[in-house]
Amino acid sequence: MLQLLSGNPRTVDALGFLLAFALTALMDSVFHDKLPHDHGRAFAVNGELSKGKARGSGLIFVLCIALVTLAVVPFKAEYVIYTVLLIASMLSGYFDDAAETAWNEYKKGLIDLVIAVVAGVTYLNFNGTEVNFLSWSFSLPYAVYLILIIVLIWASINVVNCTDGVDGLSASLAVVSIGTFLLAYGEELGDYSTAAIVFIGALLAYLWSNAKPSSLLIVDT
């Protein structure tokens, strides 16, 4: 939508970043006390330090990312599917966090696997199997590429689910990683670069709330 109002992609990127940051920061402040609170995890290092802190911040910043992304990138079926999958992944973690009894790990893992499969099939359907790396370009077999995507997404969703206290670390690394790809491949990424900038804006707003002494956690969302 904003691309229709401004013909300059850099202006759209800047607006997307500012909107994502401001909206996430505002919603974090408004809904902080309405989120479920962490009980700490006995098997996590210093897990008791998280006890009593608001958790499920992903519910806020993922919805902010979804709203801003749909406003600043062209309206295409591929992007809508990714947005729905992002929200679905967040909701599965949020309902797990909010439940009085934590979900069975197989239930959460299966939901995440379905999301990863749909995301992989969607990406390959719209982008093909060609891989570009530096000056090289080659194609992977469809099945191999799909398996790699599934493993990457499923592992990324679950890598911090069994830990406490690394929310800020994972968000910081995500900002650095996404920013590095933007610097290296910004032109080639096209609309993905705008969505990535929105992600960075929302994550930086979350990190403001997560800075020591942190009061807001992502946990499984």
Segments from the language model and where they lie:
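"…together with the soluble PPM/PP2C metallo-phosphatase catalytic core" -> "…together
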Residues: 1-221
